[in-house]
């Protein structure tokens, strides 16, 4: 895992098309902004896991 330090307002790049900007820090929460092409899915981990699990259930039941 790559670990980077950024201050509020600073950005990091993932490849050529995805940028992640630190918008703010308040207590133990960090607000980030993500710019990515529309064809790149961006989800919080818990939402991604739910989508993945729903896809697995759909395959197991034949999609209906």
UniProtKB/Swiss-Prot annotation:
- Per the record's keyword annotation, is RNA-binding included, yes or no? yes
Q: Which Gene3D superfamilies match?
A: Translational regulator CsrA
Q: Give one Pfam hit by family name.
A: CsrA
State the UniProt keywords alphabetically.
Activator, Cytoplasm, Repressor, RNA-binding, Translation regulation
- A cellular component annotation (GO) from this entry: cytosol
A molecular function GO annotation: mRNA 5'-UTR binding
**Primary location group:** cytoplasm
Amino-acid biosynthesis in keyword set: no
Q: Where in the cell is it found?
A: Cytoplasm
Highest taxon of source: Bacteria
BP terms from Gene Ontology: mRNA catabolic process; negative regulation of translational initiation; positive regulation of translational initiation; regulation of carbohydrate metabolic process
Q: Tell me the function of this protein.
A: A key translational regulator that binds mRNA to regulate translation initiation and/or mRNA stability. Mediates global changes in gene expression, shifting from rapid growth to stress survival by linking envelope stress, the stringent response and the catabolite repression systems. Usually binds in the 5'-UTR; binding at or near the Shine-Dalgarno sequence prevents ribosome-binding, repressing translation, binding elsewhere in the 5'-UTR can activate translation and/or stabilize the mRNA. Its function is antagonized by small RNA(s).
Subunit and interaction comment: Homodimer; the beta-strands of each monomer intercalate to form a hydrophobic core, while the alpha-helices form wings that extend away from the core.
Family affiliation:
Belongs to the CsrA/RsmA family.
Protein name as annotated: Translational regulator CsrA
| Gene expressing this chain | csrA
